[in-house]
A protein has these predicted regions:
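Long, charged/polar, low-complexity intrinsically disordered N-terminal extensions
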Residues: 1-157
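Extended catalytic cores and adjacent scaffolds of nucleotide/polyanion-binding enzymes
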Residues: 3-5, 24, 80, 90, ...
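Active-site metal-binding core of divalent-cation-utilizing nuclease and nuclease-like domains
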Residues: 55-69, 193-196, 382-407, 476-478
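Short, charged, amphipathic alpha-helix that recurs within catalytic cores of restriction-modification
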Residues: 61-71, 431-441, 463-474, 507-513
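Long, charge-dense tracts
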Residues: 150-368
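Catalytic-core elements of nucleic-acid end-processing and repair enzymes
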Residues: 344-404, 527-530, 537
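Conserved catalytic cores of phosphodiester-cleaving nucleases, focusing on short active-site segments
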Residues: 408-421
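Catalytic cores of nucleic-acid endonucleases
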Residues: 422-463
């Protein structure tokens, strides 16, 4: 019989798992004599009318015409000393994800795909505002076509054509492996064995070694151990010092210029804070004499946006969604960010930390308690600090449809200083990007510099300052990158202000920005702007009303 091209979806059970351990309740397995030792489950999903029938308010007679049934099949095959699940239809929804090897399909694809014949990639960029995207190409391409940031992005899925066509004509993989090849049912055990052999190789390191630098942790047992380490660290804060590996950050892109306050709820505390910071959270727990930090607090304690009186006025998040934490487990580095755990390659972690430690430090005036970026810039602008404030003084680059800020401050040394609050990695990523964009435009766009010089002259007049316009070369004058040190300045408050360390993902984006600046010919520096701990007040409580007796 002629073999036809068939597409199958294969998953690998964890070592020691049996078919009965890997299916959801209600799935009945039976021996299948078509393949030696195999087991099979066949059934349908559904049985009732579709949900949209309610919207149309259909009669029973009309609904009877719309019985919605979907068939599925699961075949469990023993091969190479392990069990494999081959799913058909919606069979995969009847499988327990925790019973299967994570990234099995991705690893097989990485080891078998032709690196110049990729077709699509599913990519996740971890941050406080994690983004996911699928990129597809119209023709065979190498990895450069997918704009993968090898120091930040996680590849969750990959598809392409294998180097050896005998293995398959097309492969795609994430946790499961989907492959297309000419075969009949009798070939399934060998197909599974070949996939398992590819899974065990490390050929991928020749072209995709960076894939192991950052991994999203999804194994429940590992997450439990990491959560336990987080709970232990928070428990230690109740009686001891707060480690510099523990922070709080907004889990969304947050505008620090909003006049928001926050409260930590879940342990009967009424304090109102002007900043989200780990020191305030710990102080509140100490004030309420929380005896020990328990696992349930990670979801039971919450952060609420509120007004100055403590009334809820905005969003809220579980405290774990806001925690940023770095720890080691079994010799490997892990990072918690936006409620997700990531395993970080130790070499990468050490490299970005060492890089940051070697960056030139720059001195900036301290911030006052409760100052955000806007208030800080406004006060320093008139404080006689040998800096001209250009905050919000936008200039449009030649041919651009948008305007940019050259910097927040132009120092009398020529340094261009960019300022942001340490509220989240996403805000800091914006800061680092702002610096590189500005530096590139300054270098390449003479007319932009002319417009900027006009802006500077206006500010000099407004603030009664002189000498700053001459620091920026006009379009008719040679431009010197050496004349402009690019400084990233981050406002940090609370415990360790001025000696803080950036969260891991911020360190990664900082190194990328600094290297780009160096490639453009600039030097780069970093400044911590120390700010006292945020002000704490008590939420105003509604006065109790005395019931008024009604005369009989």
């Amino acid at each position: 019989m002629t073999k036809k091209s068939q597409t199958v979806s294969i998953r690998l059970l964890r070592d020691g798992k049996q078919p009965a351990d890997s299916v959801r309740a209600g799935v009945e397995l039976a021996a299948w004599d078509k393949l030696e030792g195999a087991q099979i489950a066949l059934d349908t999903i559904g049985g009732g009318p579709p949900k949209w029938s309610k919207f149309l308010d259909l009669s029973d007679a009309e609904k009877a015409k719309l019985t919605n049934l979907t068939a599925y099949g699961l075949v469990f095959i023993p091969a190479s000393g392990r069990w494999f699940a081959v799913s058909f239809g919606l069979g995969h929804v009847k499988l327990d994800p925790d019973a299967f090897e994570q990234d099995f399909g991705l690893r097989v694809v990485l080891n078998t795909v032709d690196p110049d014949k990729l077709r699509s990639a599913d990519i996740r960029t971890p941050d406080e505002n994690t983004t996911s995207r699928r990129t597809q190409t119209a023709r065979r391409s190498d990895q450069t076509a997918f704009s993968i940031d090898i120091e930040r992005d996680i590849v969750r899925g990959l598809a392409g054509e294998p180097k050896v066509t005998a293995f398959a004509s097309r492969v795609a993989g994430s946790d499961g492996l989907t492959l297309t090849k000419e075969m009949d049912v009798a070939a399934l055990p060998q197909v599974c064995a070949d996939a398992f052999a590819a899974f065990g190789k490390d050929d991928y390191k020749a072209n995709f070694a960076w894939i192991d630098q950052i991994k999203h942790v999804r194994d429940k047992a590992t997450i439990e151990l990491l959560d336990a380490a987080l709970v232990a660290a928070l428990g230690g804060c109740l009686t001891g010092a707060i480690p510099d590996t523990l922070h709080l950050a907004y889990p969304v892109i947050y505008d620090p210029e909003k006049a928001r306050h926050i409260r930590y709820k879940g342990f009967n505390c009424s304090n109102v804070h002007t900043d989200l910071e780990i020191g305030g959270y710990v102080a509140d727990m100490r004030e309420k004499a929380v005896p020990a930090y328990e696992p349930g607090h990670l979801s039971g304690h919450k952060v609420y946006e509120c007004n100055a009186e403590g009334k809820d006025d905005g969003q809220s998040w579980r405290i774990k969604e806001c925690l940023v934490f770095e720890t080691d487990l079994n010799g490997e580095k892990y990072v918690l960010s936006a409620d997700r755990w990531y395993r970080i390659d130790t070499n990468l972690a050490n490299e970005v930390t060492t890089f940051f430690a070697g960056v030139t430090a720059h001195a900036m005036p301290d911030a006052l308690a409760d100052e955000n970026e806007e208030k800080y810039n406004g006060r320093v602008a008139t404080g006689g600090h040998n800096m001209l404030c250009l905050d919000r003084k936008l200039v449009k680059p030649t041919g651009a449809s948008y305007s940019i800020e050259a910097c927040d401050f132009l120092e009398n040394s020529g340094a261009m200083i960019h300022v942001k609050d340490q509220t989240s990695s996403s805000r800091l990523s914006h800061l680092f990007n702002q610096g590189t964009v500005s530096a590139r435009v300054m270098k390449m766009d003479g007319p932009f510099r002319d417009l900027l010089r006009t802006r500077i002259a206006d500010q000099e007049t407004a603030l009664g300052l002189t000498g700053y316009q001459a620091l920026v070369a006009g379009s008719g004058t040679p431009y010197s990158e050496a004349a402009h040190l690019v400084v990233y300045a981050v406002i940090c408050s609370g415990v360790g202000a001025g000696t803080n360390r950036l969260p891991f993902f911020s360190l990664v984006t900082f190194r990328q920005a600094a290297n780009e600046l160096r490639a453009l010919g600039y030097k780069c520096a970093f400044a911590w702007i120390a700010k006292p701990a945020s002000t704490t007040t008590k939420a105003k409580r509604k006065p109790k009303t005395t019931p008024v007796a009604v005369a009989a």
